[in-house]
């Protein structure tokens, strides 16, 4: 069994050694331009077209929760990957726990009005503020996949009203489910906090725009943990300036790194983190990949395969 590995920023040597230890029967090598030798599996992140084109692979693993970097290249270069080759993403591998920590900490930050107190502190102003009430602090989750379900579970501990929206209806205990474009407005109407965990597909690009933001209650909050392309940044800035949106926590952006000239940096109601809400944990990723390869070799059914038509 031959495995090729490519990631532009990961510690390649660590990964190769860890994979060799986890899959002793495999010959694992770092892929470099010009390497056309045979391979059974490819582990990749933002792979060059030549790495995958023409290969008779058993499967490709994207080294992250999203596969948009691969699917976007496939649109321009359909020869890059045979349609019959299964494409897998890292469904969790520790990302769910990280998303839970990130989402809960920020929701509580807003719920306890720490954002308002920070603004007061900046002007040396001492003034206790009325508290928010849980029953009026409904949290809506856009995108009801693996990570969305994890975030919902963690927020249930804090007894917030919860709702989710996705392409198809979900049956999550204690979570009101909305499905399809026809139910999006009803979903948004009660969301004091909107958490975006949608996949990146042609249908979701630019979905968080002026029309969507106007359907939120006045003074709502936005937490974007998915992809920057989901948000029309000018529309969000306008909503923040008008007070329609009271605050935004943004981990992802249309351009990354976020350019220094972006007005988001200096906006008093925006908090920025550099795409760190959930990073790939190497040890857990290696365990998932080795387990999945073992299942594939045995002909067993496995989880995490991407539907290329849907984009997730």
Swiss-Prot record:
GO terms for cellular component: cytosol. Its EC number is 1.1.1.79, 1.1.1.81. SUPFAM superfamilies: NAD(P)-binding Rossmann-fold domains (SSF51735). Pfam families: 2-Hacid_dh_C (PF02826). It is found in: Cytoplasm. The keyword NAD applies. PROSITE patterns: D_2_HYDROXYACID_DH_3. It comes from the Bacteria. The active site is at 227, 275 (proton donor). Optimum pH is 7.0. It is an enzyme of class 1 (oxidoreductase). It catalyses: glycolate + NADP(+) = glyoxylate + NADPH + H(+); (R)-glycerate + NAD(+) = 3-hydroxypyruvate + NADH + H(+); (R)-glycerate + NADP(+) = 3-hydroxypyruvate + NADPH + H(+). Keywords: Cytoplasm, NAD, NADP, Oxidoreductase. Induction: Constitutively expressed. The keyword Oxidoreductase applies. GO terms for biological process: cellular response to stress. Gene3D superfamilies: NAD(P)-binding Rossmann-like Domain. One of its GO terms (molecular function) is hydroxypyruvate reductase (NADPH) activity. InterPro entries: D-isomer_DH_CS (IPR029753), D-isomer_DH_NAD-bd (IPR006140), GhrA_Enterobacterales (IPR023514), NAD(P)-bd_dom_sf (IPR036291). PANTHER family: 2-HACID_DH_C DOMAIN-CONTAINING PROTEIN, D-ISOMER SPECIFIC 2-HYDROXYACID DEHYDROGENASE NAD-BINDING DOMAIN-CONTAINING PROTEIN. Catalyzes the NADPH-dependent reduction of glyoxylate and hydroxypyruvate into glycolate and glycerate, respectively. Inactive towards 2-oxo-D-gluconate, 2-oxoglutarate, oxaloacetate and pyruvate. Only D- and L-glycerate are involved in the oxidative activity with NADP. Activity with NAD is very low. Belongs to the D-isomer specific 2-hydroxyacid dehydrogenase family. GhrA subfamily. This is Glyoxylate/hydroxypyruvate reductase A. It comes from Escherichia coli (strain K12).
């Amino acid at each position: 069994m031959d495995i090729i590995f490519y990631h532009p920023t990961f510690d390649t040597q660590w990964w190769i050694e860890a994979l060799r230890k986890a899959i002793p029967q495999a010959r694992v090598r770092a892929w470099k331009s010009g390497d056309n030798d045979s391979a059974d599996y490819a582990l990749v992140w933002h792979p060059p077209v030549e790495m995958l084109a023409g290969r008779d692979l058993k499967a490709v693993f994207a080294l992250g929760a999203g596969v948009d970097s691969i699917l976007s290249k496939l649109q321009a270069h359909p020869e890059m990957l045979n349609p019959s080759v299964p494409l897998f993403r890292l469904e969790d591998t520790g990302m769910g726990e990280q998303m839970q920590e990130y989402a809960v900490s920020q929701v509580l930050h807003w719920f306890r009005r720490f954002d308002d107190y920070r603004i007061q502190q900046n002007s040396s102003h001492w003034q206790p503020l009325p508290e928010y009430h849980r029953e009026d602090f409904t949290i809506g989750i856009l995108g009801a996949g693996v990570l969305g379900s994890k975030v919902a579970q963690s927020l249930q501990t804090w007894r917030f009203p919860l709702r989710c929206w996705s392409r198809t209806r979900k049956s999550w205990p204690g979570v009101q489910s909305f499905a399809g474009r026809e139910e999006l407005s009803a979903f948004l109407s009660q969301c004091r906090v909107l958490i975006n965990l949608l996949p990146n597909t042609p249908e979701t690009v630019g979905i968080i725009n002026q029309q969507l933001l106007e359907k939120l209650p006045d003074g709502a909050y936005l937490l974007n943990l998915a992809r920057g392309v989901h948000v029309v940044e000018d529309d969000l800035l306008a909503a923040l300036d008008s007070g329609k949106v009271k605050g935004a926590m943004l981990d992802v952006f249309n351009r990354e790194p976020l350019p220094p000239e972006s007005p988001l940096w200096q906006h008093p109601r925006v908090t920025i983190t550099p795409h760190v809400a959930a990073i790939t944990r190497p040890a857990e990723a290696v365990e998932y990949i080795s387990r999945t390869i073992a299942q594939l070799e045995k002909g067993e059914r496995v989880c995490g395969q991407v539907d290329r038509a849907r984009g997730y």
